[in-house]
Each structure stands twice: as structure tokens, then as C-alpha cells.
Swiss-Prot record:
Cellular component GO terms held in the UniProt record: extracellular region; immunoglobulin complex; plasma membrane
PROSITE patterns noted in UniProt: IG_LIKE (PS50835)
Region (Complementarity-determining-3) location: 111-117
Region (Framework-1): 23-45
SMART domains, per database record: IGv
Biological processes annotated in GO: adaptive immune response; immune response
Name the record gives this protein: Immunoglobulin kappa variable 1D-8
Phylogenetic placement of the source organism: Eukaryota, Metazoa, Chordata, Craniata, Vertebrata
Ig-like domain boundaries: 23-117
Gene for this chain: IGKV1D-8
Segments of this protein annotated with the region Complementarity-determining-2: 72-78
UniProt cross-references to Pfam families, sorted A to Z: V-set
Annotated signal sequence range: 1-22
Role: V region of the variable domain of immunoglobulin light chains that participates in the antigen recognition. Immunoglobulins, also known as antibodies, are membrane-bound or secreted glycoproteins produced by B lymphocytes. In the recognition phase of humoral immunity, the membrane-bound immunoglobulins serve as receptors which, upon binding of a specific antigen, trigger the clonal expansion and differentiation of B lymphocytes into immunoglobulins-secreting plasma cells.
Amino acid sequence: MDMRVPAQLLGLLLLWLPGARCAIWMTQSPSLLSASTGDRVTISCRMSQGISSYLAWYQQKPGKAPELLIYAASTLQSGVPSRFSGSGSGTDFTLTISCLQSEDFATYYCQQYYSFP
């Protein structure tokens, strides 16, 4: 008996797998922020669907690889200063820098790891 399944049919069946997740859209704001040393800075990240606490925050400086700051929405990576904090769950998350230092001037990214393409 021939058990081969056409690729098109297999793709269609995969769409109906129980628990299959759709793509998650992420919106980070503000896209550009002006701040001075000593300021309290807040960056938000909103998901198109709930991701529990499967969110990480990264800091990237020019010419360097991104560095993990926070994972599981609010857990500080070892060695990261306590002025950084994360909060939120579900669809809305926040990264806060309580007292901005000169070495904190960088690009910040949020990343969800609840669902992968």
C-alpha cells in the first residue's frame, strides 16, 4: 500500500493540528526615545496574542551582538544592573531603566519565545 501523501495535502492537514499557533505580531514603542542620564526610561512591547511570560529583552550597542538583559518577562540575567527591570504578562510588557546611565545608551529589543514560525 502506498502511504505517500501529497505535500499540498500534508500542508493543509498541518493547518488543522490541535493547538497550532498563529504568527504573533509584536509592537515595540516608542521607536525612538530621547533621554538624559538620570532619567527613568520605559519601553513597551505589545503582542497580538497572549504569550504568558515568554518574553526577553535585549540591549545592543553599535558594532556589538545583542546582550540578554531580562528573560521570562521579569527575571534579570546574571550580571545585569538592578536599575533594569521587566514586567508584564499576556500581551503587554515593559522594560524600565530606573536611572539611566551613560553606558545604557543603546538599542533595546523585545523577543517573544512562546511561538516560532
